[in-house]
């Protein structure tokens, strides 16, 4: 989804952007463009197919990749053959056969569900949860009120939270009203035309007799959006906008709403490990299913899409609600994945505030000690992560938030587009000279969604699994390489681009090279990575 600010900007102008990526319909993009090769195919993919040719005939080990997300549809036609299955667990017998504490965890675990089978769907943003904690203590405090050093830090943080929260709530309320009004007008137009939304054409809109200036505006915008797709897509994008802002106002920013009781854990006990249920799909598995397909959808089976990696087993770990994930669940998800054999963990989520960073840091260190590679999405706020917070992070910090270390088993991924031009950096992608390691395709990514369907999505959430899939490919064919070495291989083998790209700045936008906004300075490349892995393994012999 594009950023909230852009939604509101377009609304104010009377122009509606689509939630997906707009592409001139005269230009047909290959559905698997992110696996293609720039020299051969003309798209800034990662040369997956070229790498697969290089690997033909080589022996490989199966690699478990954990998808820490909002749920995965384990019945999907293009995923069911590549799922991790717990070899020591007997499905459906209601027993913890393998003694790991999780009953019937056949394909993974759900940390945001209860023993009774109920699941968390909506949750707050972290800023809402933190305000709920600090508000009783600081709502009446004045800048002149005597406070201890710790309390002063908390009070300053609380003031920033209130500012951010107020801005978000104003945007949500504005968006809810405007998108709701637009949806009402569209519903009226659809009813008058008398066709299903999927059958409405530009000719229908041209012939429509408007009865108000607002209807004229809606028709004008609808016809403009038809240049980038269909009326049905436009209608669905508006519906998505209504849901997005309604969810923000009613759940994410609602201080009176707290669904944690569904889980039934002792939330304040960060050491608690055993809670949740085995429903790894949950109520909304689109995001996680899409991520899983990018990593490892069954290749060359004449169905759907080809994932980046073969020889992969997808482990589903559900811990991301519609809202912000909780640190306790993230930490437990990492530990569960590590303890059950994952060698790569994909984390396509993030937030601007943190409640218990040490708990997550400790889990990351645990993964590091067990040689597990973590791949994290950089975020979709078009921000510099060197200056703005995006949790979780590869940096370990102390109680004063000073950096005291860095995870060596961690890759942060920004998103790029299809063509080598100034728009190569996805307009939504976060970046950072120190904090973002690599870039990968994250625009118009076609992958699996629930009920054996397929869809194009965009985001650094799509770029991260491209890298996770590449990491799995390397670990499958070069199992002697450590997580740190796999990261080294990926970083060294990126495609450098002699082209400045546009990034947002305080003055609007500026043009920079990728090596000014990332550690590696490039886009991951599977073919070059396999060549680099070959060199590294040869040196070790």
Describe these PLM feature segments.
Residues 69, 377-379, 459:
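Active-site glycine-centered loops adjacent to acidic/histidine catalytic or metal-binding residues
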Residues 372, 393-476, 480, 522, ...:
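Extracellular S/T/G-rich loop segment that most often corresponds to the catalytic His/Ser-adjacent loop
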Residues 50-59, 283-285, 306-309, 325-346, ...:
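Mature extracellular/periplasmic domains of secretome proteins
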Residues 338-340, 344-347, 358, 408-412, ...:
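C-terminal subdomain of the subtilisin-like protease fold in secreted/lumenal serine endopeptidases
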Residues 70-74, 116-117, 301, 320-324, ...:
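Solvent-exposed loop/turn segments at secondary-structure junctions
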Residues 24-38, 140-171, 183, 187, ...:
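Short acidic, glycine-rich surface-loop motifs adjacent to enzyme active sites
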Residues 51-64, 72-88, 93-326, 406-409, ...:
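Subtilisin-like serine protease catalytic core
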